[in-house]
């Protein structure tokens, strides 16, 4: 995957007012680049996915077009969809204060990890799930033996039950098995340690935050909601699943070249060749809020007429 240097040079500055992603994608050099990388038959779907992603995350409109394009091309190269409804990968806005611009980072979702693992053909079974209160009987970290009594007779009650931990497991086609269990406290501590955008305890900095427990209880000023825009606040389970898979596969699982590239680029601003340039802190990220019950096809079917016309103009004019 490569972005023409001409595209980088034309976008190596703050996005100007009105310089929309549609305008950028309509350039002859960009259209040629798209056709060369994804093929003419896939161009419409690719452009549609970018436009839809930008509409779902308005803050992306303030990002450099090349950073959006590069992240989207990387996802395309991995054969993953940027649709927030599918949760395979996201393009997340990041404010680069040193450069004075906003850039889009490539963020792999846990469903993207699963897709890449399945496609490798080396995983016979792969699963990750939340363990609810009352379900865990025991877990031996040495033997990795676990005993759970899942509430399979009442999934509605299970959905509402308190999460006490997370379990991930894989079995390879050659019979090798590996499993992990983390308590909810382990996961919260992990997020607190590695995510600058998440705080387990209350903070008193320039922008004070309430503790995570108070956030869950709704004990925070709603005008400060932007302080809690990290996925660790908006979708803790999703981030926990991703963390479990990344820990499990990264340490013990075989990884294809595609998965290695995805691991390396995760949470990074990527360059024109899909390689990570920087791993920004995500305090400024505005995460998309979507209806996860929707499908990618539904999103495309419900596109506004002017959006579809923009796409037609981009590809065929």
Annotate each PLM feature.
Residues 1-32, 260-317:
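Glycine- and charge-rich intrinsically disordered segments
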Residues 16-255:
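Binding-interface segments
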